[in-house]
Amino acid sequence: VLFPLPWQNEKHPTDPRGRTNGEVMREILLWRSKFVLPPTTLGPLLQMSACLTHHVSSKDLKRINDLVPKIAIITGDWDQIVNPSHSKHMHKMMPDALYEVWKDAGHAIHIQFPFTFNKFLRQWIGLPPVHD
């Protein structure tokens, strides 16, 4: 759900064992799960409810556009969590925001393309690039 299947099947660029992106991501997510408390019964239900009922009106989006000095709306063209058309609508209501659609990207752009995302973010907030 978070990552496009073709990307999951590609060889991970830095994995010394030559595994795919999907294999590396599964290992990372399993490792991270060891450090979080198991959810309560109510937790996942409330999260689903929040996702299903969350709404920000066009009026509120315009107000955010007017009050927040710097906004970036970044979406993947393959986002299965937030339909890219919703991000496009957000930009329509917040025309001062930077708007980018990343090709072949899912919902977790910062995980799928960490180096590209960090480079973008550093440039966008005015920090110098990090040299390898």
Predicted features along the sequence, with ranges:
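Helix-rich cap/lid subdomain of alpha/beta-hydrolase
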Residues: 1-33, 46-49
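Structural signal for short hydrophobic segments within the conserved structured cores
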Residues: 49, 72, 98-100
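A short acidic, amphipathic alpha-helical/loop segment
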Residues: 60-63, 86-89
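Short, conserved loop/helix-junction motifs that constitute active-site signature segments
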Residues: 63-68, 93-94
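Short beta-strand/loop motif that positions the catalytic acidic residue
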Residues: 67, 73-75, 79
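Conserved alpha/beta-hydrolase "acid-adjacent" motif
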Residues: 80-86
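Catalytic active-site module of serine/aspartate enzymes centered on a nucleophile-bearing elbow/loop
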Residues: 88, 92-132
